[in-house]
């Protein structure tokens, strides 16, 4: 049965819009609230723990418009996508179209995890990437962009590399075709990382459509200026833009042209290494204890994001690396300047994201004032840096730029404010505009103006009891006693009462109109001036973007200097050799916990593979990880925790450390181990750095030993990578007898009065002692279990029957 006749016009409008956005929660604007109805209301009230009510048989709930961002934040973090429906006109404007006309409403934007622009919904030091994966003619490509900063990258990839790509990029949302999701390998990756996934049919990723989208968005007639793009690269970039257009309803921020992520320019760190080395979080998912938590001394939001990007993709070009190292050295050598620069950076706003909000019309007066304060700080930075005749600071000075005219305009126009909504007014300097000054004067002194006019009329009429009063019917009016009659033609009779006569004048009506409309007029004028300011800023947007990038780099590199100063890091020698020579190296995270034993390593060509034997708890895994981390730190342009470091450029870092089941993929610990090891021997080159811990331990002794042996041979003879291999298989130490570039080391252990002391020191040689029972004792095993283990071990060594 058709119930449309029983549904109110507002609900008809809602249901029409909801039918177009079935997969989204529809935030429907009604006055000062966003309302949700039916299943949306039931779901949202449950998630947000807000009151669910009913109007008739319609479930409903709502959130206040002015505090909606906090609710959006909670929903988006849980992976929900929200369609924002706004009122496109006022009720007064609707009435002009007809007495019963419904206020026009429409969805103006779709909020998804990867398309957030609101500052309150974004993590300051994290990029909020939206990513896309396509397959065109069996060729894969991946692209990722950030709406809030305009960053846009792409590159071709392979199916087996998608895990590493997605771990490195860490997008908040992934756009993908439904057919690709059906592939077990891709489904398991998406499930493992729990990205928000948006699926479309294959036609959405059409190459021709994507080509046209790219041309339309960037206002170009051909893509030749972007380079020789492959079909899969066109599809992945164009599809990403098409999705952004859909979510932003055509109101696109100014995105950078998509840049090819050149794999040769950056170190490749596979997904296993990213996890095992705990670059961004520990194995348990905590930030505390990760590498970035130990080295992040950045002050600004853009500096923090740059550090994270650099750590996920370290440089692989010695010239670029040494440029950064030279800048860090410059600031280390001038600590006064370093401190001055870092102090100036405090309070600098996130102008990358502010600029994007300005471009899409979502900025606030608070944003503009923050931009003004930041541009003021640029002058201070320039004053500090101009004192030094150095090519290092000269480059920064030119990139920071000067904003004399813009700063003067912002100074003249804005007053200090914390206004989040432009329609609240009160942020434009009244002295900037004579008309605005008049409106504000009228608002502030309306009573005084009425009294001034009253006194004027008393003098004109010579009636000292004359009053100017107000009511909702007449508005402002002049009232005199009925014993007086005003003959002045300027006074127009309005009303005669028993004891009084009421008049008005054109002057009084004009003042009334000014008083009543002054606030609205002032706000409208402030909005207009605000728009003009935004236009001025957009005209120099590219320059401000360059400034933001310079601030981010200055912040990151001075933070490296601060790190080096505080923890006695040294400048590494980075060149195109095959060296990896570290003196007194330390683990950048573990050393913070207290006393740390520094160790040397020399993986030069003649001993490029090191085999480490020794018991658990002796420090093998820490030693492996610390050297990989030292290599990565050097490649992001940081000084390193060592007394000396000489490192030839590393193209790839691989790690097989730790044991874990991948239950989601149905893989056992041993299968995970073998898969990760296979990735290493299939991809590592002579410029790669490999750490392997206990290969083969997840299977039988003979199987495990055989696999470990053959893997070492492969890495030594074929891959020829710099590698550190830790093992319990002491038999492997025989390899140095016939593999010329392998060298054996062990963890130094001292035994004294029946006790074992792990010295955490690397020494030449090998050992066949595992001290497993001692470790069990440290773990808290009961003495009876330890005694029984000692007895059984004695029998095993004597080849005795364990059952006797």
Curated annotation (Swiss-Prot):
One of its GO terms (molecular function) is mismatched DNA binding. One of its GO terms (biological process) is mismatch repair. Keywords: ATP-binding, DNA damage, DNA repair, DNA-binding, Nucleotide-binding. ATP binds at residues 614-621. CDD domains: ABC_MutS1. SUPFAM superfamilies: DNA repair protein MutS, domain I (SSF55271), DNA repair protein MutS, domain II (SSF53150), DNA repair protein MutS, domain III (SSF48334), P-loop containing nucleoside triphosphate hydrolases (SSF52540). Transmembrane segments: none annotated. Belongs to the DNA mismatch repair MutS family. NCBIfam families: mutS1 (TIGR01070), PRK05399.1 (NF003810). This protein is involved in the repair of mismatches in DNA. It is possible that it carries out the mismatch recognition step. This protein has a weak ATPase activity. This is DNA mismatch repair protein MutS. The gene is mutS.
């Amino acid at each position: 049965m058709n119930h449309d006749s029983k549904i109110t016009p507002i609900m008809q409008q809602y249901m029409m819009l909801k039918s177009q956005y079935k997969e989204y929660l529809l935030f429907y604007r009604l006055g000062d609230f966003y309302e949700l109805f039916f299943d949306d209301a039931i779901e949202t009230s449950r998630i947000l723990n807000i009151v669910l009510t009913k109007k008739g048989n319609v479930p409903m709930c709502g959130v206040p418009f002015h505090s909606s961002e906090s609710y959006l934040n909670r929903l988006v973090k849980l992976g929900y996508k929200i369609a924002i429906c706004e009122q496109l006109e006022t009720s007064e404007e609707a009435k002009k179209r007809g007495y019963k006309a419904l206020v026009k409403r429409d969805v103006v934007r779709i909020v998804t995890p990867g398309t957030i622009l609101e500052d309150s919904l974004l993590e300051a030091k994290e990029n909020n990437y939206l990513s896309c994966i396509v397959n065109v003619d069996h060729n894969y490509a991946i692209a990722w962009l950030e709406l809030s900063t305009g960053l846009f990258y792409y590159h071709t990839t392979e199916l087996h590399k998608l895990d590493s790509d997605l771990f490195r990029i860490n997008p908040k949302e992934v756009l993908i075709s439904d057919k690709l999701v059906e592939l077990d390998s891709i489904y398991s990756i998406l499930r493992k990382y729990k990205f928000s996934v948006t699926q479309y049919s294959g036609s959405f990723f059409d190459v021709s459509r994507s080509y046209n989208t790219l041309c339309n968005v960037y206002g170009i007639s051909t893509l030749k200026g972007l380079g020789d793009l492959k079909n899969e690269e066109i599809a992945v970039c164009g599809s990403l833009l098409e999705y952004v257009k859909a979510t932003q309803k055509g109101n696109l921020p100014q995105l950078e042209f998509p840049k090819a992520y050149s794999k040769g320019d950056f170190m490749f760190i596979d997904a296993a290494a990213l996890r095992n080395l705990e670059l961004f979080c520990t194995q348990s998912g905590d930030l505390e204890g990760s590498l970035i938590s130990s080295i992040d001394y950045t002050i600004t939001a853009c500096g923090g994001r740059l550090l994270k990007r650099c750590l996920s993709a370290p440089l692989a070009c010695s010239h670029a690396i040494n440029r950064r190292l030279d800048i860090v050295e410059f600031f280390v050598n001038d600590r006064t300047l370093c401190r001055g620069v870092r102090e100036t950076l405090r309070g600098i706003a996130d102008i990358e994201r502010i600029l994007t909000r300005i471009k899409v019309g979502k900025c606030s007066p608070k944003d503009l004032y923050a931009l003004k304060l930041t541009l003021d700080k640029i002058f201070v930075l320039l004053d500090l840096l101009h004192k030094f005749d150095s090519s290092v600071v000269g480059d920064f000075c030119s990139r920071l730029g000067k904003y004399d005219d813009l700063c003067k305009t912002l100074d003249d126009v804005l007053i200090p404010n914390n206004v989040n909504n432009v329609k609240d007014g009160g942020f434009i300097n009244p002295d900037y505009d004579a008309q605005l000054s008049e409106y504000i004067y009228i608002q502030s002194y309306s009573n005084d103006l009425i009294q001034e006019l009253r006194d004027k009329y008393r003098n004109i009429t010579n009636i000292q009891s004359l009053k100017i009063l107000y009511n909702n019917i007449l508005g402002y009016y002049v009232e005199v006693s009925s014993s007086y009659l005003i003959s002045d033609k300027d006074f127009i009779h309005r009303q005669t009462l028993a004891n009084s006569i009421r008049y008005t004048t054109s002057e009084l009506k004009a003042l009334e109109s000014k008083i009543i409309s002054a606030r609205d007029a002032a706000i409208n004028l402030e909005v207009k001036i605000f728009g003009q300011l935004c236009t001025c800023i957009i005209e120099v947007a590219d320059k401000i973007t360059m400034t933001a990038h310079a601030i981010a780099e200055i912040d990151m590199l001075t933070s490296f200097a601060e790190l080096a100063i505080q923890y006695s890091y040294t400048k590494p020698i980075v060149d195109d050799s095959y060296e990896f020579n570290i003196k007194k190296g330390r683990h950048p995270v573990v050393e913070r916990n207290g006393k740390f034993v520094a160790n040397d390593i020399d993986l030069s060509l003649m001993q490029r593979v090191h085999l480490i034997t020794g018991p658990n708890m002796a420090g093998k895994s820490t030693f492996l990880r610390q050297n990989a981390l030292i290599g990565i730190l050097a490649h992001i342009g940081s000084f390193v925790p060592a007394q000396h470091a000489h490192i030839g450029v590393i193209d790839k870092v691989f790690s097989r450390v730790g044991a874990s089941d991948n239950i989601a993929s149905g893989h056992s610990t041993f299968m995970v181990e073998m898969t990760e090891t296979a990735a290493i021997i299939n991809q590592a080159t002579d410029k790669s750095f490999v750490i392997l811990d206990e290969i083969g331990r997840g299977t039988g002794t003979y199987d495990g030993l055989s696999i470990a042996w053959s893997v070492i041979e492969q890495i030594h003879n074929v891959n020829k990578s710099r590698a550190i291999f830790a093992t319990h298989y002491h038999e492997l130490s025989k390899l140095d007898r016939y593999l010329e570039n392998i060298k054996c080391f062990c963890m130094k252990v001292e035994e004294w009065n029946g006790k074992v002391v792990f010295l955490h020191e690397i020494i030449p040689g090998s050992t066949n002692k595992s001290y497993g029972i001692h470790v069990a004792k440290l773990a808290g095993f009961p003495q009876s279990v330890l005694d029984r283990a000692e007895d059984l071990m004695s029998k095993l060594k004597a080849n005795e029957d364990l059952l006797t």
